[in-house]
């Protein structure tokens, strides 16, 4: 039997491009060339470029997402997606694959687009009984009345792009005069802006996967940092940020965080790897955001959780691919 042809897609159109490429490297190290024919497909503003497992370029037909290597046309059996942000995390790439009938790891169009839209996701989950910070969605900066917004949400508050990840374009606003510049910054990154009340407390994050067909929590990690908040620098470049797994919280709260993360995963209809971020405030877990294409670089949180939980990444990937290709 021929080996499944796996397309590892990476890159993207945002400042998360570099993180995606690092995530792809980790996946490549955990996908066996003995089990799969692996092709790395890189997307940028110029389109797709494709490489075989020797890093030699191959031709990609974007109209049907097939490859041509040594004169042979290859149909892709499964896609492993590591594109953070648009178009890999917001449903656009998933829609493209659905139209072409290409199978892919991770969330479908609806789950991806809902999860990536922070304001809509928070509203949906709040209706399901999940605690989230108070927030206002900004469609046009001309609509903002700073005094009314501060009266409703309080200070400090957070301003963030409604549709971006890795804390890009996020500001912590402490004075009313900082609000409009923060919103302008967020609009430079995303199409909509979310202004959110600040919830003070311990930052936690929890991973979720499907293991043996069962939605399973991985571990809870505690995040300690010296920055004002867990921004891009604190996540990827700081030498003082501490990511502690397992989180140093009581067992009841730890288990509650894992149960809640599984519940959110199911409510959003997610598949594949997933991470949910929280603030623990006065014994209550407030959801900050979810990640349906979580970072998988050596500096990322989910690989650390997998290591603690003794969940080998290659085994989890094998299971996901087997389900997509109907091969054991």
Language model segments and positions:
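ATP-binding N-terminal substructure of ATP-dependent carboxylate-amine bond-forming enzymes
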Residues: 1-110, 114-116, 120, 139-148, ...
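Hydrophobic beta-strand scaffold residues
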Residues: 38, 103-104, 132, 157, ...
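A glycine- and small-aliphatic-rich helix-loop capping segment at beta-alpha/alpha-beta transitions
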Residues: 95-104, 175, 180, 308-311
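Active-site nucleotide/adenylate-binding loops and adjacent lid/helix of ATP-dependent enzymes
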Residues: 2-10, 14, 22, 114-201
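Phosphate-binding site of ATP-dependent enzymes
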Residues: 174-259, 280, 284-286
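ATP-dependent carboxylate activation and anion-phosphoryl transfer catalytic cores
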Residues: 4, 13, 129, 250-328
């Amino acid at each position: 039997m021929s080996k499944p042809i796996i397309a590892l897609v990476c890159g993207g159109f945002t400042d998360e491009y570099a993180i995606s490429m690092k995530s792809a490297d980790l996946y490549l190290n955990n996908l066996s060339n003995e089990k799969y024919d692996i092709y790395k497909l890189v997307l940028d503003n110029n389109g797709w470029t494709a490489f075989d497992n020797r890093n030699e370029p191959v031709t990609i037909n974007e109209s049907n997402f097939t490859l041509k290597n040594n004169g042979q046309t290859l149909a892709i059996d499964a896609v492993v997606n590591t594109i953070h942000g648009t178009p890999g995390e917001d449903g656009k790439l998933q829609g493209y694959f659905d139209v072409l009938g290409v199978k892919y790891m991770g969330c479908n169009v609806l789950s991806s687009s809902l999860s990536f839209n922070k304001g809509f996701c928070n509203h949906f989950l709040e209706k399901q009984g999940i605690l989230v910070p108070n927030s206002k969605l900004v469609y046009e900066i001309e609509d903002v009345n700073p005094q009314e917004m501060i009266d409703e949400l309080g200070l400090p508050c957070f301003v963030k792009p409604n549709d971006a990840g890795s804390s890009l374009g996020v500001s912590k606003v402490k004075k009313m005069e900082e609000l409009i510049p923060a919103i302008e910054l967020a609009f430079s990154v995303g199409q909509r802006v979310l202004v959110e009340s600040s919830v003070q407390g311990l930052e936690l994050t929890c991973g979720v996967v499907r293991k043996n067909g069962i939605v399973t929590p991985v571990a809870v990690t505690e995040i300690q940092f010296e920055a004002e908040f867990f921004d891009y620098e604190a996540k990827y470049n700081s030498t003082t940020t501490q990511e502690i797994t397992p989180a140093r919280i009581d067992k009841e709260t730890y288990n509650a965080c894992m149960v809640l993360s599984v519940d959110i995963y199911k409510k959003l209809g997610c598949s594949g790897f997933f991470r949910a971020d929280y603030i623990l405030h006065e014994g209550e877990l407030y959801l900050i955001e979810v990640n349906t294409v979580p970072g998988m670089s050596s500096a990322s949180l989910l690989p650390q959780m997998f290591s603690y939980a003794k969940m080998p990444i290659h085994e989890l990937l094998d299971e996901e691919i087997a389900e997509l290709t109907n091969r054991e």
